[in-house]
């Protein structure tokens, strides 16, 4: 039924022995599978791909600019016999002991350095060695809780250690997801072969972290019975392995956090939530060492936690693994491990390392140079912006050039023997092919200082016609089965089926970061809607009969909303220059209040909480941004696309100056180059109409497709703040220019408030200011009526305060004047001696101030958790 493709020449064949017979594990596997199972392999492959799509398993590739691609998983598992695994287990356990002892010695007595077993230059020159950690000893002396060891099988069939991963070992989540998918497809062989289970390993990891956390809880006021709070610290959605972080946190039952979610207070670490600060006792980090703490490590890190190392040194948090453990990942260390093992463990290495020569050692490098046509040159430590060193396929001329570089900077280079990795079988549409593979095995520390090796691992397979085994270069993964002769445990951390009696309304913890991103997503979306509506109206009004009279009003509205920059309109201007400035300021590269920038910022904020959005909702958001970008490229040459603003970054309507600009790329001269004959107003109007429909769809999805928790309420609070601020400012500007009672001003307000149809239905053929103000200000059922939006804002704020359970702050309703106390319609229609609507303008200013102050108070109360500033803001 299957055609067997030949293995790579000179490589160990995992499937067949030298005589061509199937090796024992594979013989058993295919016997258990049977002819029927083999005939269904193609169906299984399709099912596997469907499960990956359904589960949205992805892997971000840097070369794709952070665009996630579907996870690459091969159908057939990688099989390891019980006897062979016992040897691997002993070797990996020994390595984990050894690496932990090296880290402890380097940050402690430094005996290895003093005795010359470990060159100081190799340690102190490595960016993974962190001086702020010197002298720190974690509880129990356990620096490493998770160690990953990459193994490859040589052509002779022996296992060799290729690399260690101690900084932030990846793959634990993917290994588990691989197991869940593949074991379900091959359920009968999985049971019959008694494949060892992975769940006890993850249970051991949690038990280890919980035990380590006890030392951080000794001074807790909550009591000794309280469970420690464990958080998995991720770089965020742009990490290549972000899916794994989400999946692993959910499986382990720990909180997934980013650096912005955490804060340090009084040498303790806290998670910022809407309900207040929650103590964090253990951080299982997925960040590289240098990015963990911008105060003491990389100052440019925006993904770390300021002050984290100080909390760690104070003994109030366990960080796993300890920052600074990355130096033992250096490939040059392999050459020194045999001697170090003899000193620290009084043992020989069970698993040998790949032959390695650090180029500083002259005796070794001479031997290595003689073999450079059969070796790889690798960096001794991570260095950015360096072209990749060549491997064996580069040719002698290329190698000679690298030899000169090595002689100039010997400490930065290490030479390793090139190994021909064993070839693992893979299913390829009716055939069994083989690819080079590397096995990653994980060791988990226990509370007594021992190690538990996960019976399985994360096998990676090279891409077609590739010798390098890497997921970044198009490789794939394989589920790893360790066979056993004994019955295996059925223990699992997966949740058991829920029974009706078990159901309860579970409260979902809302982090401050998630809430803040949704808050700003609402604000950016509302800004975009307001600006699109205003721009369509302005472009349609510039050639109308009232264009000249309305021109100053339109210019001020555009300046306020950020459609043009103040510098564009500082000189005497004409409608033509105004229009050119409007068109020149559309893209996201021209300023933080442009339509393009608001769309980009909306996508960025929603992307930070991608897990809360349905697929359709997320696609709408991306389509709105991308379609508008495409339309602008057709309309005029694009000056470049900038990045989206972060939450809170940019110019807010409420409480901030919308006209402040970071650059002048959207000046009038630039607009002249973009407009003229090439500018097609009809094309732009079509694009704006299309965008308006898309934004309405996004708004509908927000109201109909999202869980209505505190974070969702904050999204709509953000929209209400922007809406009431915009509506009051528009009313004030139109009234200030004396256009409130003119037909053009009347029509302008009805369109901007999206109330034309309602007004005509209520007051057909009549244009009277009292009727207008009643609809736009007083009427509570008008979705854009000022008083109605303001009252809904007050109620939403108090709903959030009640849901968050905070008693430290005054209710928002007490800080914002009730609608009943605001001016009546009769008062709003009063005209003073200067023919101004003074009361109307005053209440617009008052409500705008309340909205701006509410935005500041929300930030202090729920996002930054600073001391309340209400007493200052609301006075």
Can you annotate each of these PLM segments?
Residues 420-423, 428:
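FAD-binding core of flavoproteins
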Residues 2-24, 145-146, 153-160, 164-345, ...:
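ATP-binding N-terminal substructure of ATP-dependent carboxylate-amine bond-forming enzymes
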Residues 1-83, 87:
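N-terminal low-complexity, Ser/Thr- and acidic-residue-enriched intrinsically disordered segments
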Residues 371-374, 384-396, 400-405, 424, ...:
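Polyanion-binding catalytic cores of nucleic-acid enzymes and NTP/SAM-utilizing transferases
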Residues 85-106, 119, 125-130, 244, ...:
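Active-site nucleotide/adenylate-binding loops and adjacent lid/helix of ATP-dependent enzymes
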Residues 54-143, 154-156, 166-218, 226-230, ...:
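Alpha-helical transmembrane segments and their helix-helix packing motifs
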